[in-house]
């Protein structure tokens, strides 16, 4: 299928893009990599009258590290997340997840800002960034908003970004010392949409017990989901195999996986449970060397 007709304008600055968005109102859309938007256009699920191309806007593809956060420009390509030393050294789970996204051609074009703005329930980055307690910085002609991921992701292809707003940056708090994190997913073939996936982060205290946990899942409903009851099971535990199994069981309670040609809801829930177990075990393994290096 082919998209409906639309006007196309290339913005040369953030302010220019914001003026174009304000003038276009509900009928204006941002385009960068087009990973999510172009399929929606082709299937006529989205019918904007104006596309604002931000690929030439300077300063939106930078990655900056501060004492407390990593700031990632909204135009940062998925491929850059897999190769950036700043990301691999400070947020390796983000590099790990980005490598799962589709195929190299798409990773070379798709952007972190676009992935979040479109809130595709099948996307990897929202799941990981939700686990990382990330927030986005969105700008409009009226000012700036900081939006936590838990408030940004509303439903499948529905985010809380308002007409006239542009995501300019993704801000990720640095993990506490003694933390380990992991992402994994299962699909029929690499590059296909995942049947199920999970991101897990654990932090160990001086006694080797879990002081902090984050578990988020992919494929469990209409958006990325945080499993707080499962996290609570792990707090003050030694993260034994029994603890991990109990948390994985709790994580899939109350999920609402959508059955597809690739698997029933029950099958997808089982896949998610396995991914939670697997990522928790990996996160624990990665947290232990971090903790041990602190003690020497």
From Swiss-Prot:
Its cofactor is FAD. InterPro entries: CO_DH_flav_C (IPR005107), CO_DH_flav_C_dom_sf (IPR036683), Diverse_Substr_Oxidored (IPR051312), FAD-bd_PCMH (IPR016166), FAD-bd_PCMH-like_sf (IPR036318), FAD-bd_PCMH_sub1 (IPR016167), FAD-bd_PCMH_sub2 (IPR016169), Mopterin_DH_FAD-bd (IPR002346). Residues 1-177 form the FAD-binding PCMH-type domain. Its EC number is 1.5.99.14. Pfam families: CO_deh_flav_C (PF03450), FAD_binding_5 (PF00941). It comes from the Bacteria. PROSITE patterns: FAD_PCMH. One of its GO terms (molecular function) is 6-hydroxypseudooxynicotine dehydrogenase activity. Gene3D superfamilies: 3.30.465.10, CO dehydrogenase flavoprotein, C-terminal domain (3.30.390.50), Uridine Diphospho-n-acetylenolpyruvylglucosamine Reductase, domain 2 (3.30.43.10). It catalyses: 6-hydroxypseudooxynicotine + A + H2O = 2,6-dihydroxypseudooxynicotine + AH2. Pathway: Alkaloid degradation; nicotine degradation. FAD binds at residues 30-37, 111-115, 124. One of its GO terms (biological process) is nicotine catabolic process. Binds 1 FAD per subunit. Keywords: FAD, Flavoprotein, Oxidoreductase, Plasmid. Molybdo-flavoprotein enzyme complex involved in nicotine degradation. The subunit gamma (large subunit) contains the substrate-binding sites, the subunit alpha (medium subunit) binds FAD and the subunit beta (small subunit) has a 2Fe-2S ferredoxin-type domain which binds 2 2Fe-2S clusters. PANTHER family: XANTHINE DEHYDROGENASE SUBUNIT C-RELATED (PTHR42659:SF2). Heterohexamer of 2 alpha (kdhA), 2 beta (kdhB) and 2 gamma (kdhC) subunit. Dimer of heterotrimers. This is 6-hydroxypseudooxynicotine dehydrogenase complex subunit alpha. It comes from Paenarthrobacter nicotinovorans. The gene is kdhA.
